Swiss-Prot record:
Residues holding Zn(2+) 3: C449, C529, C535, C539
Positions with a binding annotation for S-adenosyl-L-methionine: R561, G562, W563, N635, H636, Y678
Gene that produces this protein: SUVR2
Family: Belongs to the class V-like SAM-binding methyltransferase superfamily. Histone-lysine methyltransferase family.
TM region positions: none
Ranges of residues in domain SET: 550-679
UniProt free text on domains: In the pre-SET domain, Cys residues bind 3 zinc ions that are arranged in a triangular cluster; some of these Cys residues contribute to the binding of two zinc ions within the cluster.
Organism: Arabidopsis thaliana (Mouse-ear cress)
Basic and acidic residues bias: start-end ranges: 61-73
Domain (Pre-SET) ranges: 458-547
Protein name: Probable inactive histone-lysine N-methyltransferase SUVR2
Residue span of region Disordered: 61-136
């Protein structure tokens, strides 16, 4: 910092105390020479050393003038004639006494230094030194000053120069800049000083005390410095509310409230009301929700952390700043800021300011710093859906899955689209999905099984009815079964297409001429034990029914593909991830919805063509735009996706409805995005799926192949 700026700050600090620049300049020069221009020592405690030096010099000057005056009078007395009669001598002695009294008045009205006290005593800079030439106090300023009338203990000498009217434990050596504006009521007596004549009178019933019941003496000059020859009013404020503290009470966070001028008596909220309001504020404004989050717990952690830093600060001085911060509410700063109206309009918009324990002094150059800016966050008006979405940060399933599935956005400030989470698919309206025990034959279930059907000792009918189990004892897909499913999905040579006589998709278009069916891919399916089976819920043949058990996370992709799903742990090959859940729509219902807004449905056509799909209520699809689960966030990847969808029968033997479960096609590392092939050909015949531009980045991307084929055709032409 430039020296001229230090000098400017010193003059400004002295002006605030009522000291003229002419008195400051010579003393400041002497201090700079004495401290070898070390501004850090001079600027400490709001230039306290400079103020003391100014008053000491003024006091010495007054004493010196008084002594010189007395010496002159003594010389005059010695030169008087010896023959002066007794009457003249008495008159001369009375005049000498009067002059002594008048000389004593030349000393500045200042707190006298006690024996053994150092030269750093603090005096008032605002009260001048009255002289015999004229009055030093205007007649208009004759309001009384209230002062305590009791002695100061000798052991408090180190605090004698500080005006501390309230005690906030455990702070000591409070600087002048942080002196409270108000004083509490106590039991000590008050003195009234009439400024017009300096007379002191005791007023009964008015007291000044500290927070712990002890009293501190305050000199008239100290009070006069802060009152500037005006009435020092004692304002009674409500007691501070203790918000939090450390375990043993060394560190505390207190909250005080100063109502606006002229306002009615406010209702001071209780701790429970404040806690509920702040937790709701955190949910609405800061978009954080953790079941274990507590505002009071957070503040207690602040106190504990502050205590740890304060007690261990010496050992880690090179790592931590010298001035450790503490948290306090600054009502005065709010009144002076532009946020005053916002604060007074709603009491819940309290603002917490971080300030320094050493009155925000810059650690490097010793300059007095400014307090940090206050920010008032406006309260957001959220809809029910937005509130539900913000509440799902820790678990987007809202507890409907067996594990928590958080969501995170590390790219921008977007949030996931609003939807209703469902763990299993639900019928929208007309879909013929009926689960009944009467439709399950005895040879289609294992009612005689108990425990785990995958145990070697079990002779399960479900295994014989569907050519063995699809799962291993570890809950993974059989290697051979998984490879067959992957080959059917990726290798056109091994794909088998089934054709309908009257395709429900073509019928739903309601065109004059019905176009022929374009074919439906036949898929292998998994048959799990169901309600009529006698095995347990944790049977090895109930993998999909047991739900999600891996750690997954919804995240915003950095490559421009929007939201995606990734795993937080390593997944083996053949592991179940989740099922595709959504609204079960008939094809006519789906086409009606497509006409209103674009959708991305999945057609349940694994058995179309092999069986007669009679009736529109049996041609079904899944649509997860408004009702769905985490599968709606899985992005597309051509051909080499790490997930594959497989039909799973779990409630009924009817082939027109089944679950669509996702399994891993290979080993997947932690934090890797999960993808599956939508099966979209990316041409004009993608109906009813909404068209989109493929951004999978795969080496086998079908869009790249179409572009390369088009280039080859142009070259041949």
């Amino acid at each position: 910092m430039a020296p001229n700026l230090h000098i400017k700050k010193a003059f400004m600090a002295m002006r605030a105390m009522g000291i003229e620049d002419a008195r400051v300049k010579p003393v400041l020069k002497n201090l700079l020479a004495l401290y070898e221009k070390n501004w850090e020592l001079i600027a400490e405690d709001n230039y306290r050393v400079l103020a003391d030096a100014i008053f000491d010099s003024h006091e010495d000057q007054a004493i010196q003038e008084s002594e010189e005056k007395k010496a002159d009078e003594v010389k005059e007395d010695e030169g008087c004639a010896a023959e002066v009669d007794r009457g003249k001598k008495k008159l001369h002695e009375s005049i000498e006494d009067d002059e002594d009294v008048m000389a004593e008045s030349d000393r500045p009205l200042k707190r006298l230094r006690r024996r053994g006290e150092g030269g750093s005593a603090l005096a008032s800079p605002s009260l001048g030194s009255p002289t015999l030439e004229g009055p030093s106090i205007n007649d208009e300023e004759n309001a009384p000053i209230l002062l305590p009338y009791h002695p100061v203990p000798i052991e408090n000498d180190h605090d004698a120069g500080e005006l501390i009217l309230t005690k906030v434990e455990p702070i000591t050596n409070m600087p002048l800049s942080s002196i409270p504006d108000s004083v509490d009521r106590g039991d000590s007596s008050m003195l009234e000083i009439d400024k017009s004549n300096g007379h002191v009178e005791e007023k009964a019933g008015e007291t000044v005390s500290t927070a712990d019941g002890t009293t501190n003496d305050i000199s008239p000059t100290t009070v006069a410095r802060f009152s500037d020859h005006k009435l020092a009013a004692t304002i009674e404020e409500p007691p501070a509310l203790e918000l939090a503290s450390s375990a043993s009470g060394e560190v505390k966070i207190n909250l005080s409230f100063a109502p606006a001028t002229g306002g009615s008596n406010p209702h001071l909220p209780s701790m429970e009301e404040l806690r509920r309001a702040m937790e709701e504020k955190c949910l609405r404004s800061y978009k954080i929700l953790d079941p274990n989050f507590s505002v009071l717990g957070f503040m207690n952690d602040i106190c504990s952390c502050y205590l740890d830093l304060a007690t261990n600060g010496r050992d880690s001085a090179n790592q931590l700043p010298k001035n450790l911060p503490f948290v306090t509410t600054n009502i005065d700063a709010l009144k002076k800021s532009a946020a005053r109206m916002a604060y007074t309009s709603q009491a819940s918009n309290d603002v917490v300011e971080i300030c320094s324990n050493e009155h925000m002094r810059d650690a490097e150059n010793g300059a007095v710093g400014d307090s940090m800016a206050l920010v008032v966050v406006p309260e957001c008006q959220l809809s029910a859906d937005e509130w539900r979405l913000i509440s799902s940060v820790g678990d987007i399933s809202l507890g409907k899955e067996t594990v928590e599935i958080p969501w995170v956005n590390e790219v921008n400030d977007k949030v996931p689209p609003v939807f209703h989470y469902i763990a299993q698919s639900l019928v929208y309206q007309d879909a013929a999905v009926k689960f009944s025990l009467g439709n399950i034959r005895d040879d289609q279930c294992c009612s005689s099984c108990c425990g785990d059907c995958l145990a070697p000792s079990m002779a399960c009918r479900c295994a014989t009815a569907f050519n063995g189990f699809a799962y291993t004892v570890d809950g993974l897909l059989q290697e051979d079964f998984l490879e067959q499913c992957i080959s059917e999905a990726r290798d056109p040579r091994k794909q088998m297409l089934l054709y309908c006589k009257e395709c429900p998709l073509e019928k739903a278009k309601k065109e004059v001429i019905l176009e022929p069916c374009k074919g439906h891919l036949k898929r292998k399916a998994i048959k799990e034990c169901w309600s009529k089976c006698g095995c347990m819920k944790n049977c090895g043949n109930r993998v999909v029914q047991q739900g999600i058990h891996n750690k997954l996370q919804v995240f915003f992709t950095p490559n421009g593909r929007g939201w995606g799903l990734r795993t937080l742990e390593k997944l083996p090959k053949g592991a179940f991830v989740c099922e595709l859940a959504g609204e079960i729509l008939t094809i006519p219902e789906l086409f009606q919805r497509i006409s209103d807004r674009p959708t991305s449905p999945v057609i349940l056509d694994a058995y179309w063509g092999s069986e007669d799909i009679s009736g529109d209520d049996k041609a079904l699809s899944l649509e997860g735009t408004h009702y769905g689960n985490i599968s709606r966030f899985i992005n597309h990847r051509c051909l080499d996706a790490n997930l594959i969808e497989i039909p799973v029968h779990a409630e009924t033997t009817d082939s027109h409805y089944y679950h669509l479960a996702f399994f891993t096609t290979r080993e997947i590392d932690a934090m890797e995005e999960l993808t599956w092939d939508y099966g979209v050909p990316f041409n004009q015949d993608v109906f009813p799926t909404s068209p989109f531009h493929c951004q999978c980045g795969s080496d086998f991307c079908r869009v790249r192949k179409q572009i390369s084929k088009g280039k080859n055709v142009k070259k041949r032409a």
